[in-house]
Structure formats: structure tokens, C-alpha cells
Amino acid sequence: MIVILDNGGQYVHRIHRSLKYIGVSSKIVPNTTPLEEIESNKEVKGIILSGGPDIEKAKNCIDIALNAKLPILGICLGHQLIALAYGGEVGRAEAEEYALTKVYVDKENDLFKNVPREFNAWASHKDEVKKVPEGFEILAHSDICQVEAMKHKTKPIYGVQFHPEVAHTEYGNEILKNFCKVCGYKFE
């Protein structure tokens, strides 16, 4: 099972449905859920930090990003929370928009296996990662955002600014499936 921490984003239920579509069970929990409670459930194989409107109401996710022993995928706000947890910088986007964006994959990696080097993704660019934390590397960028995706160099921690769970994102299910593979799921 994948635990989805609900940061109040409008697409949290889309994450749940997208995982169900690819055959992975998931559970949406409040973003105040303690890490010990999540990790004490032996069925949990990974954590997704959802998008949301307010960093201040999602501070527990910083503790989870720093201390979880499970793989983590941060989406939009979740991505930004991972950056903050590890000492990166988040700020207002120069091009504040909510639209389809062409994403360019800079580095082959587990998250973008079987995904083209360029694809269209639905993205919210109100805030974004301005500086990648030490120990992380940029995996993808767009013309309006230099950090569309990042990964910790030694831990299975990923962040994406765009929304793989939204139907408009090409290869979104493939990206979610790739994260689930990192968590130990097998697909035919």
C-alpha cells in the first residue's frame, strides 16, 4: 500500500484513483499523521506527499521527508516540502501559471524509465523550488521552471513540480508506476 498524505490539494483523490488504475492500493491520510503510525503498518511500501495550497499547514511532511525509511514522492507542494526539509529554497515562480507545460528529462533515472525525454505535463507554478538542496540532483526542467523534478542522490526520495496524476500529463501513470516499482511493486 502507498500512503498519500493529504496536504489539501485539489488532486489528492486523483492520486488515489491513478494508483488504483495501475493496480496499487493506497490510503489517503491527514498530513498530520505521525511518521511512526505510517511506518508501523507493515503493508505500507511508500509515501506520497500531495499538492496543496499552504506550506504552513504541511510542516509534518518535513519531518516525514527527513526521517522516513520508506520511498517518498512529493508532488507540487510535496516536492517543495522535500526541498525545504533538506535545506533547499522555495519561492514564487517567475511565470505564475497553471497549465500544460513541456517537461524535459535531463537525466535517466528510475522515475522516468520508459518516458520520453520530452512530454507534456499539467503543472501549477505559483511557488517552485528555487535552489535544489545539497545531496539532490535535478532530473527534469521546463522552459518556465528549472526544477520540474529532483531526486536525492542516495535515498529513494523524489519530487515533481508537475502533476503526474492528472489525465493531461502524458506518461503520468508510467511515472507513478515507476515510483511504485521503487517501492517494490512488480508490474507485468
Curated annotation (Swiss-Prot):
Pathway: Purine metabolism; GMP biosynthesis; GMP from XMP (L-Gln route): step 1/1. InterPro entries: Class_I_gatase-like, GATASE, GMP_synth_GATase, GMP_synthase_A. Its EC number is 6.3.5.2. Keywords: ATP-binding, Glutamine amidotransferase, GMP biosynthesis, Ligase, Nucleotide-binding, Purine biosynthesis. The active site is at C76 (nucleophile), H163, E165. It comes from the Archaea. It catalyses: XMP + L-glutamine + ATP + H2O = GMP + L-glutamate + AMP + diphosphate + 2 H(+). The keyword Transport does not apply. GO terms for molecular function: ATP binding; GMP synthase (glutamine-hydrolyzing) activity. Transmembrane segments: none annotated. Residues 1-188 form the Glutamine amidotransferase type-1 domain. Heterodimer composed of a glutamine amidotransferase subunit (A) and a GMP-binding subunit (B). Catalyzes the synthesis of GMP from XMP. This is GMP synthase [glutamine-hydrolyzing] subunit A. The lineage of its organism: Archaea, Methanobacteriati, Methanobacteriota, Methanomada group, Methanococci.
